[in-house]
Regions:
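N-terminal Lys/Arg-rich, disordered targeting/topogenic segments
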Residues: 1-22
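N-terminal Sec-pathway targeting helices
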Residues: 15-35
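Sec-dependent signal peptide cleavage junction
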Residues: 39-58
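Functionally critical loop-and-helix segments that line ligand-binding/catalytic clefts
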Residues: 52-90, 224-279
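Substrate-binding cleft of extracellular glycoside hydrolase catalytic domains
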Residues: 70-196, 202-204
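Hydrophobic anchor at the start of a short beta-strand
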Residues: 134, 207-209, 229
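Short, electropositive alpha-helical surface patch
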Residues: 152-160, 221-230
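Aromatic-lined carbohydrate-recognition surfaces of secreted/lumenal glycan-active proteins
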Residues: 201-218
Length: 279
């Protein structure tokens, strides 16, 4: 960033100016202007790269809805874990929720142990019983490709025959504990981990997805990962980031839904094409 445009004034010259000459400061100024213009052009290009027209995004009764040609094309979802406790899934469905993303498990951020979410099976049974489609997400703390593959296999065992039709999500976030085992991994390593996970999930016939907010995604070489993006940014207007095109957006962590006693994360899926056949 250029913080000052002041330049020292040179002493008067005894030589006459050449009418066709260009002084060095002028050349430098021209170069600076060109660089600024280039960055402005890139910024404008990045700001317009999203494929969505946010004027078609509406907040209706606390829920985000996306329209195309006057028709609602999005679906409304929630994501839950054992933090929400026992859920009345019939009440959830009756409240207009179209799908759910269930946390199926996590890896410990310090010791690296794999855990199944305490309410996972209860949530699977409840959502299935009322006919509410769902996907799953796993909180990864893998430090290498081998551990990422281990996580993918762990999930595939959990969801085998469970009727998952929505994406299987790789959720890698740094933890506040300074001893977090994956906090200081390089972008290359984090990317390789995500690639390994998503490739295995896709091989098994499910739709892989990567979750993150602006910071989480910036830690990855996201364009090298063959997976959809579930983006997190809490606002009641529209996403402000154009970091990457995403197909699902987590827009609130304080949602109110019948059948759930706590606040809950609210999500919108923009395109139904990301739903896979039941397995």
């Amino acid at each position: 960033m250029i913080t000052s445009t002041s330049r020292e004034q040179s002493a008067p010259s005894n030589h006459p100016k050449r009418s066709s000459g260009i002084r060095l400061p002028v050349v430098i100024a021209a170069i600076i202007v060109a660089i600024v213009a280039l960055f402005a052009s890139v910024a404008m290009s990045c700001s317009s790269q999203t494929k969505y027209d946010w004027s078609n995004l509406k907040l209706e009764n606390g829920r985000m809805v996306y329209y195309e040609d006057g028709n609602a094309v999005s679906t409304t979802g929630i994501d839950v874990s054992d933090l929400q406790g026992s859920i009345d899934w019939q009440a959830v469905k009756n409240d207009g929720i179209d799908f759910a993303m269930l946390r199926c498990g996590r890896r410990g951020s310090t010791e690296g142990q794999l855990y199944t979410d305490k309410n996972y099976y209860e949530n699977v049974e409840g959502a299935t019983r009322v006919g509410l489609p769902y996907g799953v997400y796993f909180f990864s703390q893998a430090t290498n490709e081998q551990e990422a593959l281990e996580e993918a296999e762990y999930i595939l065992n959990l969801i085998n025959g469970a009727g998952v039709t929505y994406p299987v999500v790789y959720d890698q976030e740094p933890v506040t504990d300074s001893s977090g085992r994956a906090n200081n991994l390089s972008a290359d390593q984090l990317t390789k981990n995500a690639q390994t996970f998503c490739k295995r999930i896709e091989q098994a016939g499910y739709t892989p997805m990567v979750y993150g907010n602006q910071y989480d995604l910036s830690r990855l070489n996201i364009d090298q990962i063959n997976a959809a993006v579930w983006y997190a940014e809490y606002t009641d207007t529209h996403p402000t980031s154009t970091y990457h095109d995403f197909v699902m957006w987590q827009y609130s962590h304080t949602g109110k839904v019948n059948g759930i006693k706590t606040d809950v994360d609210m999500d919108i899926l923009f395109e139904a094409s990301w739903i896979s056949p039941e397995r």
